Amino acid sequence: MVLAFLAAAAGADEPAYGPELEGFDYAFPVQRFELESQRQKLHMSYLDVRPRAPNGRTIVLLHGKNFCAGTWESTIRELTQAGYRVVAPDQIGFCKSSKPERYQYSFQQLAANTRALLDHLGVQRVTVLGHSTGGMLAVRYTLLHPQQVEQLVLVNPIGLEDWKALGVPWRSVDDWHARELKTTAASIRQYEQATYYAGQWRPEYERWVQMLAGMYRGPGKDVVAWSSALLYDMIFTQPVLYEFDRIQAPTLLMIGQKDNTAIGKDAAPPELKQKLGDYPRLGKEAARRIPRAKLVEFPELGHAPQIQDPVQFHQALLKGLLR
């Protein structure tokens, strides 16, 4: 049914994709890890890209809320060229992985799923690199598995402030779901331009807009919206910043200074809204709280520096990785 729908939509100006991103191709071969979690048989899609000249190190890339393993495309190329093996999963609930209707989402659970994948691949020591929501997951993973993580890299992580404690109104999962059902390419594009790319726009960004919007045009729109709602509830209610002082791994904190991301900002009162997502301040505060942190700032970049200016970002990343 999904394939028939996608075939019918193939000639449209704007693509339609399945609930697991059927019809959208990543730049690298996608593999599947079958797992059982919470009495359900699920699958976790992932990329495992090996270098031609290995340096013996593995980096795990953890994507953000509106990103996928596939959006790490240029980062994977740079890292493998430098000798790193790269493992980039699509977390359960995202992109090409299972989207169960009933699932107790937590960063601990996503970390457990990721650990199971790495065990399956025989990977023991890793650098964990998390972007956006993936940064919150990377922190939780590092706290749960301190002996496995040799370095933590956080790229514009969200959750550097506790929105709920600051007074951002709580939304029910049903309210998040209703909000997500209204998602369009135009709304995605507007948000990404303002937040990810500091007001800039280039044609190459459109691919990632259509990747997301295509799932909302497809036959699994409601599944995708419901999964997104469950995930937003997890992000909003499960802060990790109160445990920053427990992080043992050396940490590279990379912050685009034009970022203004804050979950639930659209529902916040005006006087609070203008204070949220102050990344120049939040990055410095996080660097002070994380014991072995090194802060790298990108003055002109937004929430997605690895996409907005890949040359500048990857130079800083490769320089900051442990030798």
Regions found by a protein language model. Give the residues of each.
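Conserved serine/cysteine hydrolase catalytic core
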Residues: 33, 217-288
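Catalytic active-site module of serine/aspartate enzymes centered on a nucleophile-bearing elbow/loop
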Residues: 280-323
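Conserved HGGG/HGGXW glycine-rich cap/lid loop of the alpha/beta-hydrolase fold
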Residues: 38, 42, 47-96, 316
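Flexible "cap/lid" loop of the alpha/beta hydrolase fold
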Residues: 139, 143, 152-183
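N-terminal cap/lid segment of alpha/beta-hydrolase-fold proteins
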Residues: 19-49
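Conserved alpha/beta-hydrolase catalytic His-Asp/Glu region
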Residues: 183-245
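Glycine-rich "HGGG/HGxG" loop immediately N-terminal to the catalytic nucleophile
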Residues: 31, 70, 91-107, 163
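Conserved acidic catalytic loop of the alpha/beta-hydrolase fold
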Residues: 108-126
